[in-house]
Structures are given as C-alpha cells and as structure tokens.
Amino acid sequence: VAVHGSAPGFDALADDLDGAVRLADAAHRHPGAATTLAQLLRASEGQSTEAGLLLESTAYATLQAGPEHAAWLADRGRRVRPEEAQPPVLVADEGDRFHLTLNRPRLHNMLSAAMRNALVESLRGLAAGDDRPILLDGAGRSFCAGGDPAEFGNVADPATAHLVRTSANAAPWMDRLAERLTVRVHGAAVGAGVELAAFAARVEATPDATFRLPEV
C-alpha cells in the first residue's frame, strides 16, 4: 500500500496518507482476503474475461474455506427472505430495443440466485436472437445494491459454490453482448451492481448514482 505517485509497483495506491493508512488497517484485519485479492489482481492482469472470472471464483472459493469467512458468517447470523411474488427480472421488447429491469425494488435489487438465473436466461436468449440494443436498469431507488447477504454462505461447501458461479454467471453473457448493452445506473451500485455495469460498452449514470466495492 502506498500514496498515489510514490510507488507504482505497489498493489494498492491511495490518494493520500489517510487513505493508505485505512487500506493498510483493512489488510491487517483481514490478511487472508487482502493477500488473495492482491494475488488475484496480479494473476488476472491481461487475461481474457473468461480466464479472469475463473480465477476470481477460485480465489473466492479459497476464502470461503478460510477462518475469516467463517468468522463473518458466525457474526452476522442467519437471514431468511420471504418468498417473492414478482419476477426478479422484467423483460420487455420495446421494438427498437430490449429492456431488462432488475426487479427487487424493496431490497434495492440485491442480486439473489433467482435474479441471477433469470438474468442469465434472458441474456442467453438475447444472444441467440437479433442484434437490437439492450438496456439494463433497476426498479425502485437503486440499480443494484450488491449480492443478497441473506444468501451468502447458503451453498453447502466452497467447491459446490465455485461450480455454481462458473456455470450460472451473467458476466460471460454480458461480455458477449457488451457492444449492444447499455446499463443505466441510479442510486446505489454496490459490489455485483458495479460488476454488472462494468461489462457494458455504455454506462449511463444519474446524478444520484454511487459506486462502491465493499471488498476493496
């Protein structure tokens, strides 16, 4: 960790000394996650999207098997979401374009397994169809406030979780459709919300849009 401009060979560059201290403190508190992140960023530089996603999932599975993740799960307790009546992704053919809307507005469109699967199914269908533009946005007050913490740790083991991530993932389909895709961000874009937007060739952000990666 270093202040920006002082040491280009470092893994993390902060804007000022206070930022560098905060980064160093976070790395000290979570050394496994910090080290794995640095290794992942080094290894994935210059890789294809597919290779980068595979490396990321493998790194995440490693952390899921470690003590830091176990302590986090024990500390947060278990959450249960009520069954949702509305589809997690809305799909509309608007003639000149396709319009996909993340549809969990009460939860700021936190990405659940059901939403992920619906998004993958929609994107797969659009990839097989014509080449009209695609707009992706979110219902309610936010675009996407990240993965749903109620589902974190629900998969039986890290190996199974890795297989799920690498077989049911919207990212490869968004990468394939990137030139057709516009993501419209309003309100919060956190974690997975930032990642979804990053795969689009065009991102439109409203004045109230905020972007945050809690892992960094």
Give the ranges of each region predicted by the language model.
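Hydrophobic/aromatic residues within transmembrane alpha-helices
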Residues: L37, L136, L196-A198
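Short, active-site-adjacent cap segments at secondary-structure transitions
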Residues: A38-Q39, R141-A145, V190
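Charged catalytic carboxylate motif
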Residues: T36, A114, A118, T166, ...
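C-terminal alpha-helix plus adjacent terminal tail
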Residues: V1-F98
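Hydrophobic helix-cap positions at the C-terminus of alpha-helices
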Residues: A27, L126, M174-L177
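Glycine-rich beta-to-alpha active-site loop
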Residues: V1-L17, A170-V216
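Glycine- (often His-adjacent) and acidic-residue-rich active-site loop
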Residues: G138-P172
